[in-house]
From Swiss-Prot:
Subcellular location: Cytoplasm; Nucleus
The protein, known as: Histone-arginine methyltransferase CARMER
Any Pfam family matching the protein: PRMT_C
Domain SAM-dependent MTase PRMT-type: 122-429
Amino acid sequence: MFENQQQLLRLHGCKLFIIGENDNLVNKYGHSVAIACCYDPQGMSVRVFREGSQQQLEEYPVSVKTTHLNHGITSHILIVGGEMIYVKFASEEDCQSFRMLLQNMSGKVNSVFNLRTEDSSASQYFQFYGYLSQQQNMMQDFVRTSTYQRAIYSNSQDFHNKIVLDVGAGSGILSFFAVQAGAAKVYAVEASNMAQYAQQLVLSNNLDGKIIVIAGKIEEIELPEMVDIIISEPMGYMLYNERMLETYLHGKKWLRPEGKMFPSRGDLHVAPFTDEALYMEQYNKANFWMQTEFHGVNLVALRDAAMKEYFRQPIVDTFDIRICMAKSIRHTTNFLTADEKDLHRIQIDVEFHILETGTCHGLAFWFDVEFAGSCSQVWLSTAPTESLTHWYQVRCLLQTPIFVKQGQVLSGKVVLAANQRQSYDVEMDLKLEGTMITSTNTLDLKNPYFRYTGAPVPAPPGSNTTSPSEAYWGQLDAQGARNAVNLVNGITVNGLGEVDMTMINTNLMPIGNQPNIHPGLISSTGRQQSQQQTTPAQPLTMNPTIACAATSTQNVAQQQLIGGAISPSLFTTPTQQIINSHHAQPIHGAQFY
């Protein structure tokens, strides 16, 4: 049971004392208490309960950095939050069990995860994924969730009567898919406090014999047996952000020979792009610091630092693929054969054959992952040509753009250097072949700029090959001819019907063109209450309109930038929320909260 895994140790008949200034002991509660030592992502939580009751009196967070001392054979001292706590156990055996737990926790300080991760980053990371609202955001990404479901269902042969490991299980949704596909048993490993919610879902769905929730990091837990297949959703921005892929690969120590991994491989695509508006947007932000009389203060000394800071931010949004100036370069990672150390420094050599003349403002990134099953191959894509996901696409600007001509070759390299903040420094070094022109930049993938607003993605300037005005009026004329209507300045004559002036090439976004995001049946983070009457839920293919109230009062923009960003469905119009269409374009006029 999960309680036994979450609750590492429970001891009765304990007494807690506070050590005063004169080293005198003061019984904190005046009676015996029970102590429960429970799993926590940062170590463990020591919880104090009234004896014979579930009433919790106190909770002390204990990490590998917590100072603690042995005192005799039945007592131990903890120093937590500046307070010295003297714990007297009922027996020598109980005290030894408690000390053994502390030793085991200290031994985990050198786990692979802890060695590569700052404490502050890990704390923020696990806190983020411990919120139901964040799990909901990912689950409501229709493309993400449904692709995983399709990949598992269509390869049920790989799951039938198999032992499955779900790495970073979160809510456990992938574990449920595996059981539905016939898995004999699923070990759902989750390091955040979401593990307790996953266990609640397992119990309420009567699957406690099929799905075993294990609270802990895959680098630190032990499994009772080897597994046949590993499932996970470890992708971040630009595929590698969050460094969860390393945890996914680490899980292979439990994988049987010839076992499978879902996903099986990941492709990171890189392409040069042109976008003068985006470049000037970032450039002009830094020009704030060009003021010489800002409330009597000269700010110019900080302008260069501000410019560097803005251009160190990767841009998270979506774009028209026609801004790409060359075919994308693909960097592939085979998860079945790759080692986690291979992801510590990723170098991608690039050679772009320019297809059109213009200014290259930087490099665009997106990724695809493949589920290579025995029966079918399924792909999940975040390409700008596909339905929008909560990963969007990422663009990295050059502070000094390069003017390129059709037929020229732009070469160089992109290096992703892993850091202890569970992210990467992105180093770009580009050179225009046959010239002395070069441009470099280093960006901080941990600090992206989430630019997507929900507005329609405009076509690149100069995309029209015919007159849009003539095409618009020509289609109106054709419509009028079909309806046998005589028009005078758009007004019907002789009562012969009307021409719809809004149906062709307007700047208004059709209601049906919304991101392909499944809303589920509950309210969503960041969503506004619809003022529009809704109809009962219908099948997915019916494109239902669902009104939901926000479930979180936190700043959604800040919440969503650790993993993927806000699901596109959570962008709202002032009067309505339309979701689950077959297109990847957002609602016109939507606002971001």
